[in-house]
């Protein structure tokens, strides 16, 4: 898997809406029209489940070609899993007809399912391999966890909103992602009983990198996290643990994510 997506970090920046966030990236045309997009569900022909699945597969292919590969994602493994994960099963019913557009969508509780591009980018930057153990902070609807699970890794995911955690856990079980484990908790403290992790991914922006997450990384492990002020421009960081007390960080560009939610002290 590619260790870095260096083509994204350039001087000229374009503002793109991703994952309920603003992502500042390079000169690639990021507002590209994805053909006609998936048709409204009401307009789909009444046919068998197999035909319906094929229609979703075609929409996923269009999403991947025009919203992921065209924007610079190069990992064959990530591209393959983005073609497989049924995103329409992770959005509310009223948004199913928009499931394969390259946009974030509301999932309730003031949260969103991330834009497919940002999911692919962050997954690629984790640089995981089959058999790895990964911690996700911010389960949401479970889509990012499903993408990770398709890479044959063990996924531990934490969601602070109890209803979202319960719904995501049920959804992941129904789709048979048995290598996912959901916890309702404050993600700031990670999951110490299951540490260390080969990689950690955070899908909301704190104003600093939580120390517990750094300490729960294996030596050589990678943390991908947006950091910055609420409502302002943040940065997406890739942090590698080099030794017990040494870390190397690299910016992947400017972003704007929802704030990192904490339990009240």
Enumerate the predicted regions with their spans:
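Positively charged n-region of N-terminal signal peptides that target proteins for export
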Residues: 1-5
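Class I SAM-dependent transferase core
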Residues: 9-14, 21-135, 146-147, 151, ...
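Conserved nucleotide-cofactor-binding alpha/beta core module
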Residues: 127-248
